[in-house]
Structures are given as structure tokens and as C-alpha cells.
Amino acid sequence: MEKMIPFIRVMEDGDIEKLDGMVDAFLLEENPDEQYGLADLLTEYGFIQEAIKTLEHLNFLFPEEDQLKIDLAQLFLELNKEDDALEMLSNIEKNSESYPQALLTLADYYQMIGLYEVAEHKIEEAIALLPGEPLLQYAKGELLFETGRYLEAARLMEDLLASKSELQGVDLSLKIAEIYSAGAAYEEAIPYYTEALQKEAAPEVLFQAGYAFFQVRQYETAAKHLNHLLEIDPDFFSGYMLLAETYAMLEKNEEALSAITDGIARDEFEKEYYLFAGKISLKLGRVKEAEGFLQEAIALDPEYMDAIYILSSLFSQEEMDEELIDLYETLKQEQFEMSSMYPLLASAYERLEMYEKAYEFYKLAYTEHKEDAAFLEKYLYFLLEDGKREEAREIILILQELQPENSEWFDMME
């Protein structure tokens, strides 16, 4: 390991020219085992070209060592040198001990370029040679997972888990949970998330588990996992929204608002946080707070339709007519129009006794709300008040079609 320390320092400094010279000298002076170790180190630090140079040197010295060809092929694939990789793998004979691994490398390549049937064929060929090899079964499971065959993938991984197979760097319980979750089988995923969390309460696993519990409406448990997540990783931003939604489902709106404002404190540029905070504030009856949150959401995205609609509806409901009109004018300056605001603006101008503007927006709204009986009724009485009887007659005829059981519309025509 001592011989690797100078390489680590040079790689951390990013001095490629010096590194090349050191690699050349190492290939002349040191033994093959240490050279192979250097190739691993270079790969680990991302110096792929230098790792290839080292392995090519070893492959020249030991052409019968097929593992070197596989290592080279994998590095060539990282550099998108598919032809070089395929040529290297084609030199491995079927009777070689390394042939199953070569097939697995080919399967990875075909999976990467989307030729899933070819990839599966290569894996099956390798399994036929080594039927008890867990790594090959796992590779097949991953392929099934990627191609959306979730139940098959989960069953295969469960068999691996039951056989006590251990794969370096793989938590089979977590993998099974992820597969079931991807297939929306959250009930089946939950026991495996629980197993995975007993080994390590990693932030991503806590989030995934929290989401699974949320999906099956076990909100208290979801909140427990999400609170734990945010305690150990306050910068796991998506945890705040899910926690707030969880509290909202429990009708703990104060806690929901607290969770989402914590999220805003961590990420003040996430418009969805402000929208959610606005909605929860409305549920709590805090109109002014809701207005502030919604205004912030729109400031971040002037075309954020959900926030615009809710704020417009709030202004209309509270008869904050001037605020509604100001919002519309501000959006118009941004070259953004939202037709769902037209009925609200018509009512606002009518309340302000600005009848010409009200009529203008009623007409604009009419084109898209001809089947909205509530809007048409308002428009009808506005037209009658304004003396526009012919236009009112047209609206009455439409209301008769929409609400034939309402005698009021027929009485008006008599």
C-alpha cells in the first residue's frame, strides 16, 4: 500500500502528466500483482485511460489470463469504446473459467443499450454454466427489475435472500423492498424496508420506507420514519413535503405547517413548499399567511397555475377585488394569461361597479364556461341588470338545456 501513496497524492492533485510518468516507471519496475493493484486504484479514482494502459501491459505479458480481458472490456465500456470491449470479450474461449463472467459483462452491455432480450439470453447462458452462482441470479433479477417485470424480479431476489446468499455491497432486503415499491406493491415492500432499517437507518431508506407507509395509509409510522430522516439529514429536502403531507392526512394541520415551513427554511426556492404552506394556512383559517405563501410561490414562478388559481380564488372569496385585479395585471405584464381567472375578475369588477370591465370579462369567460351553470346564472343576472335582454335570452336557452328540471329558466321566457 505504501507504494500507492504517491499515486494517490498525484491523482488528488490532478497532475495527469506526472501521473503518466509514474505509471510508466511502475510498469517497468514493479511486479505484476502490484501493477494489477495499481490498475484497481486508478479505476477507483476515475483515471480510466491510465488503468487501461496498465491492464493492456499485463494482458500483453499474460495473454492467457482472461480476467484481464474482462477488466479491460469493462473499462472500454465506461469510455463508450464498445468495439474494443466486444473484441476483448470475443477472445475468451467458452471453456474458460472466466466465460460466465464474460457473458455477464456482455449482458451488462446489452442491457445498457436497451437490448434486453439479448441481455437476458446472455445471463441465462451464464446461469446454465453456473446454476448455483448468486451473482448471476442477482444480475437476472436486476434485469427483470429494469424491464418492469417486478413480481418475477422480487420472487428471484426473495429466493436469494432465503438461500442466505451474500453479495458484496448489496442489501437484498432493501432491493426487494425497492422492487415491490416500483410495482406499487407497498404492502409487500414494508416488511423488507423494516428489515433493511434494522441493519442501517440510512436517509434514503427512511424516506422510501416513509413513502411506502404513506401509500398504505399508515401515517403515524410514516411520520416516525420521516422525522427520524430529517433529524439525521436536515438537508434531505423531499422529506419535508412528504412529512407535511403525512401530517395533513392525519389532520394535524399545525404540524403540517410546521414541517413545510422547516422545509422552506432549508430550501427557500422550492415553489411547491410555498403552495402547500398556502393551502394548509387556508385550512387553518390564516388568510393573510396563506396569501403571503402563495405570493411567494408565484414570485418564484410567475406561471405557476396552481398557486395563481388558489390565490385568485382566495381573493375572490374574501372579496379582495383590487388585489385580484392587481394580480391579473401583474401576470399580464409577464405575458401570462389564465382564462380560469376571467369569471372571478368579472365578479370583482361587478362588485366594484365597474360594469364595462365586468361585461368584458364575462364575455371572455363565457367562451370557456358555456356548460358551467353557476357561472351562467351570474352572467344572466348581470346581463338582465345591464339591460342586455337579447344576450340574456341566449343564456336562458343554454340553462334550460343544462337544467331542464329548473322551472325558473322556463318561467323567464314567458
Predicted region positions:
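Structural marker of alpha-solenoid helical repeat scaffolds
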Residues: L28-E29, L61, K94-N95, L129, ...
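TPR alpha-solenoid repeat register
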Residues: E34, L68, A102, L136, ...
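Register position in tetratricopeptide repeats
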Residues: E12, E44, E78-L79, M112-I113, ...
